[in-house]
């Protein structure tokens, strides 16, 4: 009986943990799992699935910027919570209702040629969902430790800020290293 009387008092002090509003962002490989392409073949199609899960408490407007870099260029910085200074190759904008997820399929084709004399892989273009992005013959140097011509494809997440009327970096990105040999 004492417990029944005291339960409203106890409820004030012991309640379910409050969840913090957040956005989850992840990438899945061609088979909708964590099997990602690494050793790429020029001209082949590599599907990726980007998923954004909105747990912000309200509908949200997002933008994903796709970028590519070699080992010497800087990417996003997890410790300083900053995005990469590289220009995006393309972007995707969309809205996600509260408590729901959006999945974007991104089909990528890397067109490149290996220059054995110079010890580089020359990236001519990346085709994103059928649209060509000129990479201007971007050289990817040989990495003797990885035994590969490494490039990094990454996607940065931005959230629309109604107060400023701009998209702001949401401190979330996904990244895949690929070998263009």
Protein language model regions, located:
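Short beta-strand elements
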Residues: 163-181
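Short aromatic-acidic-glycine turn motif
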Residues: 21-28, 32-35, 68-90, 164
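Helix-rich terminal scaffold detector
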Residues: 1-8, 114
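Membrane-interface segments at or immediately adjacent to transmembrane helices
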Residues: 6-63
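Internal, hydrophobic beta-strand segments that form the core of beta-sheet-rich folds
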Residues: 65-67, 120-167
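Intrinsically disordered, low-complexity Pro/Gly/Ser/Thr-rich segments with frequent PxxP/GP/PP motifs
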Residues: 81-125
């Amino acid at each position: 009986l004492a417990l029944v009387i005291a339960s409203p008092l106890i409820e004030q002090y012991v309640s379910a943990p409050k969840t913090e509003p957040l956005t989850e962002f992840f990438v899945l490989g061609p088979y909708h799992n964590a099997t990602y392409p690494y050793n790429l073949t020029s001209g082949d199609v590599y599907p990726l699935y980007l998923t954004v899960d909105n747990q912000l408490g309200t509908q949200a407007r997002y933008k994903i910027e796709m970028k590519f870099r070699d080992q010497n260029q800087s990417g996003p910085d997890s410790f300083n919570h900053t995005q990469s200074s590289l220009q995006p190759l393309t972007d995707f904008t969309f809205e996600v209702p509260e408590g729901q997820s959006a999945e974007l399929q991104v089909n990528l084709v890397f067109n490149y040629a290996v220059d054995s004399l110079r010890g580089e892989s020359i990236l001519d273009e990346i085709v994103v969902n059928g649209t060509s992005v000129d990479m201007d013959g971007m050289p990817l140097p040989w990495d003797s430790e990885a035994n590969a011509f490494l490039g990094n494809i990454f996607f940065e997440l931005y959230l629309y800020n109604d107060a400023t009327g701009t998209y702001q970096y949401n401190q979330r990105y996904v990244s895949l290293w690929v070998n263009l040999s």
